[in-house]
């Protein structure tokens, strides 16, 4: 923790001064953050509410405004249409509102939930009644598509309706059902916190209750279902939103059952139990989602058997397997560094972490989703420790490998984010070297949308009688400390173009409070001023 102390500058503040410095019953959780650690027993830093912070001007305010005016609306139109694929229409078909067949990737449901999460996060800042009405219309259809037992996956439901005997719940890991439901749970929590409504939260709870029953005693076959494990983060967040311990137990089960898989793979991080892992392997999105989920479980349980591999894997990534952009996953395709048991076969990996220092520039994969997963993971590591080194990685990824995934006009996207683009290559790579409005695998664009919509949530944190300033950008904060005292701050800066940051304390209670300022890794040793 020494680095945490070195990389934060603390000041005390007290008014009157100006400080210039660089159908269901649920507890009311509206106003809390995207990852709500307000009551997490092992969180050193508490998140602030979605409605307590907003961008005001500058770099991030411009991108948030673009998300509001262009990215969310244009993507909403794409997902409600059928020109490229089917997203919302699959829900309408599953609900029996229109006739048709399922079309699109098996993870389209989850990607639609990501867009819904991003649109919901915008509501915390805009209170746009038209957007809220539109989301409620969509949520009503999602609810109608859900089976009475809580199961919700449009691809499986539509295929089962026409007699497909292979369309059964949790039969095929490549149906991505848990991934889809994980994003449903997260979207539901954000929607509830942004609006105070429980319509989507009720849908998510019914789905989670089905998962609790189904995975109460997981078999090796069920354990293989955990591909792109967003469901761990989702289940923990649902526990935080509802206070129901069974959802935390479910998240712990999702982690533990990975040790049940027979003939597991590095590609899916289930060759050995998570608690025995020491380095990042396999599909980088799946890996980073797993690490973020494990960090979420640690925040609630304090289990040292989770923290030990998290620290070891983190060190392996940032010192040997991460690009200077914060990008993760260097390989398009390859063989597992750990080899295969059968000498006549290989253990393939793709979109994956490679060997130590295997970081090609031109053929870098660095999928946008993996890079967002890196930020999600490091954010949770920071919340658990208060160590600035984790926020350094969040900032590194957000400014570079995450934002590069979208165009300046908010309508076109990258799937991969190479560090070098060669005009001539001996072979054509899988993904376009130019941004496009749509990819057959459409996971990255809505992930970027929700990340930008929720970006202000990373700026500040709280702990007892202190405010943490984690990121720099023109913003305003209006929150309360543990003793109930109100704190209002305004941050003015042209960061990252200019390193001068001015923080004004607009209001606070009668008691002094701490103000913890992260010293960016590139800025150590510079002089700070107080005025």
What kind of feature is each model-predicted range?
Residues 11-12, 23, 69, 516:
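Generic N-terminal simple sequence motifs
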Residues 31-531:
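Glycan-recognition and catalytic cores of secretory/periplasmic carbohydrate-active enzymes
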Residues 8-9, 17, 117, 289:
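Sequence-pattern detector for short linear motifs
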Residues 12-14, 40-41:
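Hydrophobic alpha-helical segments and their boundary regions
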Residues 14-27:
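Bacterial N-terminal signal peptides
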Residues 1-13:
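N-terminal secretory signal peptides that target proteins for export/translocation
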Residues 4, 25, 217-221:
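Generic structural signal for short, solvent-exposed loop/turn connectors between secondary structure elements
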């Amino acid at each position: 923790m020494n680095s945490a102390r070195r990389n934060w500058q603390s000041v005390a503040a007290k008014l009157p001064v100006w400080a210039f410095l660089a159908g269901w019953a649920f507890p009311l959780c509206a106003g809390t953050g995207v990852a709500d650690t307000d009551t997490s027993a092992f969180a050193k830093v508490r998140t602030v509410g979605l409605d307590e912070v907003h961008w005001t001007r500058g770099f991030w305010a411009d991108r948030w405004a673009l998300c509001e005016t262009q990215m969310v609306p244009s993507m909403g139109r794409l997902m409600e249409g059928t020109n490229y694929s089917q997203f919302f229409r699959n829900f309408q078909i599953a609900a029996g509102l229109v006739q048709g067949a399922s079309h699109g990737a098996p993870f389209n449901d989850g990607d639609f939930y990501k867009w819904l999460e991003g649109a919901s996060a915008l509501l915390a800042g805009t209170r746009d009644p038209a957007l809220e009405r539109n989301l409620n219309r969509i949520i009503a259809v999602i609810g109608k598509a859900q089976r009475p037992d809580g199961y919700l996956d449009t691809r499986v439901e539509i295929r089962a309706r026409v007699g497909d005997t292979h369309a059964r719940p949790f039969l095929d890991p490549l149906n991505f059902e848990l991934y889809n439901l994980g994003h449903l749970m997260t979207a539901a929590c954000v929607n509830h916190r942004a609006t105070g409504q429980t319509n989507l939260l009720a849908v998510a709870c019914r789905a989670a209750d089905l998962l609790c029953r189904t995975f109460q005693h997981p078999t090796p076959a069920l354990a293989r279902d955990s591909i792109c494990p967003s469901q761990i983060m989702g289940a923990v967040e649902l526990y935080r939103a509802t206070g129901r311990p069974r959802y935390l137990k479910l998240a712990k089960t999702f982690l533990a059952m990975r040790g049940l898989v027979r003939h597991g793979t590095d590609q899916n991080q289930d060759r050995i139990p998570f608690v025995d892992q020491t380095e990042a392997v396999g599909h980088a999105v799946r890996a980073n989602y797993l690490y973020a989920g494990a960090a979420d479980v640690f925040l609630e349980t304090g289990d040292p058997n989770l923290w030990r591999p998290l620290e070891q894997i983190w060190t392996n990534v940032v010192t040997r397997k991460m690009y200077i952009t914060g990008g993760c996953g260097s390989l398009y395709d390859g063989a597992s560094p750990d080899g295969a048991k059968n000498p006549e076969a290989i253990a393939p990996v793709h979109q994956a972490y490679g060997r130590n220092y295997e970081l090609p520039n031109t053929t870098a994969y660095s999928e946008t989703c993996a890079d967002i997963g890196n930020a999600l993971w490091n954010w949770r590591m920071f919340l658990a420790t208060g160590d600035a080194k984790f926020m350094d990685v969040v900032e590194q990824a957000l400014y570079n490998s995450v934002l590069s995934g979208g165009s300046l006009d908010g309508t076109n996207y990258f799937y991969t984010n190479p560090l070098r683009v060669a005009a001539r290559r001996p072979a054509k790579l899988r993904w376009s070297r130019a941004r496009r409005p749509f990819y057959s695998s459409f996971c990255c664009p809505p992930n970027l949308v929700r990340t930008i919509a929720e970006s202000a949530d990373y700026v500040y944190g709280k702990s007892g009688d202190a405010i943490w300033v984690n990121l720099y950008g023109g913003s305003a904060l209006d929150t309360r400390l543990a003793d109930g005292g109100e704190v209002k701050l305004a941050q003015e800066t042209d960061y990252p173009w200019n390193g001068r940051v001015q923080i004004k304390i607009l209001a606070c209670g009668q008691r002094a409070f701490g103000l913890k300022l992260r010293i960016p890794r590139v800025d150590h040793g510079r002089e700070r001023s107080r005025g």
